[in-house]
Structure formats: structure tokens, C-alpha cells
């Protein structure tokens, strides 16, 4: 296969999406998920351009704390300096490019390169060079510090952007999606959350966009997670026979098209979306008996109900899911290749919550979200099988039109209650308009990046034969 030039890439990306509202057509090309060269463009024009989730501030609470992360293809160190300020530094020595630290986290005021012992402070400044006498007198350490990206935090959630020329703030990027971070953070009387010790990291044999779709897919719940639904129903029967109540979320109604349940979704600018539903038995949530009265008193009944009586899957496109439902989970998406994705799963909770609430949160997390839980393995199988199915090139298109005749493009009672302005609203948990927003943003970012590349370079594709004729 020959490499595409810029114009050919623009045509390809333009042709990957077929949205014709007047005809009720909403479909995407499956080769969005199967092109190795496209993956490199996605890394350059999406993951190395927009704000990408890096870590939570609770993971680096002290001066000189750090974690190592991957932003697109770039190895990064996210650190606090000696004054507590945040930095996002490329984890590569300015001398010959070796990584400075090879551990996941720690506390260091100085990073010493294991290769040639150049030393950098936790704010990225180069402070020492081994055997400096062989360098010229004008060798300037102050100009050789670690390259840094933009870094910002919203209510403890730390994001990095490698586009140092961009002017958009993190809050601009998040937009109305911030409200759904607030709904979790506000459950804490101190306004602080914390990532719990330990995390799971796993890979699946599929494209990164599959995970972004799946976390917003209410349609698959009652089929793919049937075993979990059945298990919960069995627990309910056993507990009822003992006179006890169910101690986990009653998942049985989700995704079954129950018209009595207030559910649906919002899609926002920049590709963000949230899937929500009434929670059948909200009193099983960690700390419910103390958190709910606190929220009602401080924020009012409606906002308290949104925080504690509704489950929410928030996708901050393209790199993070914040699940506040069966338990509370951060699901970080890290693309590895066009057909391989790493997911990092962490439990996040209210800082200072009671030991009983914390125990409940962890048990509920392990039950469904953990790698060995009853939910995650089901989804990973479907990612793998979708990626296999996409090789069936006779059919190019996937349909994402479910419920299009009921999508709303103006205010609803729910959006007014929350003070938000979604670009699309769905009134049913299983409708697929969230993907229209998600993949529309994918196309916008790629095309915008390609157009900017076209302005910066003159793209020439040589015909080998004509060149030889001239020789």
C-alpha cells in the first residue's frame, strides 16, 4: 500500500463519516479503526494537541512528588517542584535522549540521567553537567532544561497539552462537562477526592476509539453484561430471603428500554459526553446517609439528586472516563497501536470518608470494574471481536443512528436544572447520538490538523518514472 499525501488523507478522513440528518443516516467507516498510518496522525493531531488527562493531584500531594505518564507517543514526568507548582516535562534527557526516570512514581528534588549524569531539578531546570570542562565557555545550562507542555488542574484533575502554541484553557476545553466533575467532588465536605492505592492496567486487542464508544454504550448492558445482571438479581433474591437489602447497584433495568426511568445523555463541545440514568437503589452508594443530607443542605434537592440518585459515565474526550455509578472509577485510555490499547483503571473516592463507606466503595469497584470483576472481561471480548469483524471489508460502514428521531438540539428540563447547554441531548439510555458527537470531533481535529500542515509545507508526490526520464 502506498503512503497517502496530504490531500489524500483529507479526502479519506472526510469520507469516513456519513451524517445525513434529513435522510436519517448516521454511519462511520470501519477503516477508521484499521489504518496503521491513521493511528500516527491521531497521535500527532489529537493526543499530542488537545488536553489529555495525566493524573489526579492526590497522587502527587507533596513537593517534589512525581508520576510518569504517556501523552500520545511522548513519555512525560508530571511533577511538583519544591514550591508545589505543577510541571509536565518530557521524560528524556536533553543530552542524548535517555529517559530520566524509569519508575511509575516517587519523590525526587533532582532527576539524574542514568546515562551521562546530567541533573535536572523537579521543575525541569538543568542544574549540573558531569565533567563540564570539555564544553565551550558559552555552554548555557539555563537554555537546556527539559522541554515542557502546558499543564493545568481542575478540582484536582490534572491535564497536559503538548501544543505549547495553543491558547485554550483547560476550563475552555472541559466546558459544561465540568458540571459532572463537580457532582462528584461536591460529595466531599472538604472538596477533595483521592485516588485509592493500587491500580489495574490491561491491554485489549482493539483500537482506542472502541473504549471511547463503549463507556457511553447503554445499548449493550443487558446483553453483554447479562451474567452480571443475573448475578445481582440472584443476590437480591437471596438477600430478600434473609430479610437483607441488596448492597450493590441494581443493574437489571439499565439498557432495557424502561420508559419509567429518567435516563439519557448529553453531548458537549470538544467531543465530551455523559451517559446518565436514575439509580434504582441509591442508598447503597458509599456514605449515602451522610452525603445526601449534606448535599441537599448545601446545593438543594435537585443537584443532590443528580449527584447521588443518578449514575453517570462521563467521557472527557479522548483520554478519560469518570464513572460514578456502581462505584467510582477513573478509566484512562492510552492508545498503543492501531489495534492495541492500554486502559488504566483506578478507584477514586471522597477524601476522609468513613471506613465503612471506603470498604463499600472498594468492594463495589472490585465487583464490576476490576480486571477480574464481572464487567470488564465482557467488554474486552467485544472489543477484540469488533476489531476482527472490521476486517470484513465487503461492508465498510457501522450504523450509529439508533434513536436519531428523538435526539434534541435545544434545552430540556434536565439541562436547565443543571445549567448546561449540550450540543445534542438524548432522552433514552440506549440511543447512539453520543457517537455522532464523538466521531464528529475526531474528524474535526484531524482535518484541522491536516489543513494546518498543508499551510506549513509544500506536499510533493514524485512519479518515479518521470524522475528517471529526466535523468
Curated annotation (Swiss-Prot):
Reactions performed catalytically: anthranilate + NADH + O2 + 3 H(+) = catechol + NH4(+) + CO2 + NAD(+); anthranilate + NADPH + O2 + 3 H(+) = catechol + NH4(+) + CO2 + NADP(+)
Cofactor requirement: Fe cation; [2Fe-2S] cluster
Binding site for [2Fe-2S] cluster: 93, 95, 113, 116
The keyword NAD appears for this protein: yes
pH dependence: Optimum pH is 6.3 for the reverse reaction.
E.C. designation(s): 1.14.12.1
PROSITE patterns hit by this protein: RIESKE, RING_HYDROXYL_ALPHA
Residue numbers binding Fe cation: 220, 225, 379
Keywords: 2Fe-2S, Aromatic hydrocarbons catabolism, Dioxygenase, Iron, Iron-sulfur, Metal-binding, NAD, Oxidoreductase
Cofactor note: Binds 1 Fe cation per subunit.
Limits of the Rieske domain: 52-160
Effect in UniProt of substituting residue 217 to E: Loss of dioxygenase activity and lack of iron at the mononuclear site
Record-linked InterPro entries: Anthranilate_1-2-diOase_lsu, Rieske_2Fe-2S, Rieske_2Fe-2S_sf, Ring-hydroxy_dOase_2Fe2S_BS, Ring_hydroxy_dOase_asu_C_dom, Rng_hydr_dOase-A
Reported function: Component of anthranilate dioxygenase multicomponent enzyme system which catalyzes the incorporation of both atoms of molecular oxygen into anthranilate to form catechol.
Family affiliation: Belongs to the bacterial ring-hydroxylating dioxygenase alpha subunit family.
Name the UniProt record assigns to this protein: Anthranilate 1,2-dioxygenase large subunit
Organism whose genome encodes this protein: Acinetobacter baylyi (strain ATCC 33305 / BD413 / ADP1)
Gene expressing this chain: antA
